[in-house]
Amino acid sequence: MASRVVEPLVVARVIGEVVDSFNPSVKLNVIYNGSKQVFNGHELMPAVIAAKPRVEIGGEDMRSAYTLIMTDPDVPGPSDPYLREHLHWIVTDIPGSTDSSFGREIVSYESPKPVIGIHRYVLLLYKQSGRQTVKPAATRDHFNTRRYTAENGLGSPVAAVYFNAQRETAARRR
């Protein structure tokens, strides 16, 4: 199972540019608009991702706590992402086997608004060592997932998924 989950993340350079290689161990389901499930590499329209998704997580039991991070490594555009990364969302203290609504939103959801090219939006799940141990990020701009997770003692991700989005033009809306 692990290689099927990790391989698309390697191909899309999520592993390498955002996080180091890891072994997925927890189920992660991301659903926008009640029915649009996120699968690695699929494209979602900006209108679909305007409101925060429902994020369901597995895990052993409700005593385990998880942190969810959503970031865009392609800012301002994928060919020259000199502003990498832009932070879109952080939810902490999510009990295992529940969803993100049971956690603490320490950085509110910011709707993706890609301007130049096709952007990758990455959702990463980390197991916490305890509750209320993760601090809010200082800024959304120039966010660094590796540094942030190291500073907060989060270790390697236990799950990840990414999707693509690009600016909606009038022609694409038809």
UniProtKB/Swiss-Prot annotation:
Record's subcellular location: Cytoplasm
Key word Zinc present: no
An example Gene Ontology CC term for this record: cytoplasm
Induction summary: Down-regulated at the onset of flowering.
Source organism, top-level taxon: Eukaryota
Pfam families: PBP
Gene3D superfamilies listed in its UniProt record: PEBP-like
PROSITE patterns: PBP
Assigned keywords, A-Z: Cytoplasm
Function comment: May form complexes with phosphorylated ligands by interfering with kinases and their effectors.
UniProt similarity note: Belongs to the phosphatidylethanolamine-binding protein family.
Record's protein name: CEN-like protein 1
Gene (UniProt): CET1
